Amino acid sequence: MASYFDEHDCEPLNPEREARNNMLLELARRVRGAWSWAPGGRSLFNRMDFEDLGLVDWEHHLPPPAAKAVVESLPRTVISSAKADLKCPVCLLEFEAEETVIEMPCHHLFHSNCILPWLSKTNSCPLCRHELPTDDDSYEEHKKDKARRQQQQHRLENLHGAMYT
C-alpha cells in the first residue's frame, strides 16, 4: 500500500527548510533596506544583529548561560552525616557533614564553587544535561520550536501508523 504522500503526489512539510527560507528572505529584506539608505552603504549593515534574524543555529552552538534568577533560586542543601561520603561530580572531593551545597532540579548536588561558574557559561547540569531556563529569548524560542516540531513529527507518525492498522 502506498503512503499518503505517494497517493497525493506531495511531500511532507519540512519545517526546518521552511524556517531557513523565511530567515534568508528576511535577511535579504534587511540587507536591501540597510544598503538603500545607509551612508556609504556600510554602517547599518555592519550593525545588523544576526540573532535578531534568528540566524543563530542553536543545534551547532553552545547553549547560553542559565538565567541568573533561576541560579539564585536553586535550593541550598545541608549535607547530613549519612551523605558525607558523596562526592561533588565536578571536583571529585567528598562533601563534608553540615556543608551547604547546591541542588539542581535533577537532584544532583554540587559545591557552589564548582557549579556556579559552570552555570554562568551554560544552562545544563554537567552530569545529565537537564536544562535550566535562560535569559536568551532566541534560545528559549528555539527550544519551543524544537518541541513543537517533535510533537508534529510524533502526530504525523501516529497518523501514518493509524492508516495501516
Swiss-Prot record:
PROSITE patterns, sorted: ZF_RING_2
Zinc finger (RING-type): 88-129
Organism field: Mus musculus
Annotated region (Disordered), positions in chain: 136-165
Protein name per UniProt: E3 ubiquitin-protein ligase RNF181
Subunit and interaction comment: Directly interacts with ITGA2B and, as a result, with integrin ITGA2B/ITGB3. There is no evidence that integrin ITGA2B/ITGB3 is an endogenous substrate for RNF181-directed ubiquitination.
Function: E3 ubiquitin-protein ligase which accepts ubiquitin from an E2 ubiquitin-conjugating enzyme in the form of a thioester and then directly transfers the ubiquitin to targeted substrates. Catalyzes monoubiquitination of 26S proteasome subunit PSMC2/RPT1.
Positions bearing Phosphothreonine: 165
